[in-house]
Amino acid sequence: MPKIIEAIYENGVFKPLQKVDLKEGERVRVVVSEVVAKTRGLLKGCEMEEIIEEIESEGFL
């Protein structure tokens, strides 16, 4: 099941902001998301609900 882990990018490395339950050396897939800050206010009510449903169905939330 996908998990959302907040991280900060420093010196070319993503550093999680909380403890992560992974084995040392385990591979993960990182999805970088800055969408909220860049698109705030562009979408209106109905469109936003459809987008949220699509994101949730893809496992990002």
From Swiss-Prot:
Taxonomic superkingdom: Archaea
InterPro entries linked: AF2212-like, AF2212-like_dom_sf
Keywords: Toxin-antitoxin system
Any matching Pfam family: AF2212-like
Family in the record: Belongs to the UPF0165 family.
Function: Possibly the antitoxin component of a type II toxin-antitoxin (TA) system. Its cognate toxin is VapC13 (Potential).
Protein name as catalogued: Putative antitoxin VapB13
Organism: Archaeoglobus fulgidus (strain ATCC 49558 / DSM 4304 / JCM 9628 / NBRC 100126 / VC-16)
The organism's taxonomic lineage, starting at the top: Archaea, Methanobacteriati, Methanobacteriota, Archaeoglobi, Archaeoglobales
Originating gene: vapB13
